[in-house]
């Protein structure tokens, strides 16, 4: 098992300077480009990179400031790169004997993440799972079309209330319909349920195909 801390250290100590110099942060892309519907940038790489999934951990702080596109003018510009794994946590444990198993969730966890992008479960200090990273991804995708309804809100409880009560169709009114299906699937998940990555990946591919965006 590769430890999240080791990944974070290696990236921060050896390559952070290169990311800052050569890799435009997604936040910078958002501030300079409003993506026309139905053409959100292919963020699927963030979640479905097979290496990321196989590590058995969740990031817990996915946000535009922790995601960078490849160097401008290169083929890597089409791909997104995740960094800053300082808050990552394993959800799979390796016992001394026997197969890997899921870590038992804590009844109450410390808040980890960013208020704008974290899930309702994170606001409520529940144990984060794979679905919580996907909620972060969804909010990032929505923000590519414009500000989130709570973008200018600073009070934590109010942000949580807006996320809990907002109608998904209202939140996604300027987004491709596939993102509504994406969101509906997330509402069926919990800590133990494995997300249907094939379904979610296919939904994002459909968005890309509708916008005539090549995956590779």
PLM feature spans:
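Conserved structural core of kinase catalytic domains
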Residues: 1-40
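Conserved hydrophobic alpha-helix
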Residues: 29, 49-52
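Catalytic-loop of the protein kinase fold
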Residues: 35-36, 52-75
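Activation segment/activation loop of eukaryotic-type protein kinase catalytic domains
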Residues: 67-112
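Conserved C-lobe activation region of Hanks-type protein kinase-like domains
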Residues: 72, 114-116, 120-176
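Conserved C-terminal C-lobe helix
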Residues: 174-185
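Terminal C-lobe "cap" of eukaryotic-type protein kinase domains
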Residues: 187-215
């Amino acid at each position: 098992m590769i430890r999240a801390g080791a990944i974070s250290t290696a990236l921060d100590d050896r390559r952070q300077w290169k990311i800052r110099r050569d890799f435009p942060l997604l936040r910078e892309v958002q501030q300079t480009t409003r993506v026309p519907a139905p053409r959100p940038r292919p963020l699927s790489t963030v979640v479905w990179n097979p290496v990321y999934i196989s590590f058995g951990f969740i990031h817990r702080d996915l946000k535009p400031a922790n995601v960078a596109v490849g160097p401008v003018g290169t083929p890597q510009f089409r791909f997104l790169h995740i960094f800053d794994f300082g808050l990552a946590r394993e959800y799979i444990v390796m016992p001394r004997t026997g197969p890997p198993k899921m870590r038992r969730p804590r009844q109450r966890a410390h808040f980890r993440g960013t208020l704008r992008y974290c899930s309702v479960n994170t606001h409520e200090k529940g144990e984060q799972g794979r679905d919580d990273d996907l909620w972060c991804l969804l909010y990032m995708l929505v923000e590519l079309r414009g500000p989130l309804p709570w973008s200018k809100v600073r009070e934590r409880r109010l942000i949580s209330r807006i996320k809990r009560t907002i109608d998904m169709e209202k939140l996604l009114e300027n987004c491709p319909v596939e993102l509504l299906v994406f969101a509906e699937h997330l509402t069926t998940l919990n800590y133990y349920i494995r997300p249907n990555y094939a379904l979610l990946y296919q939904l994002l591919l459909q968005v890309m195909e509708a916008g005539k965006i090549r995956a590779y």
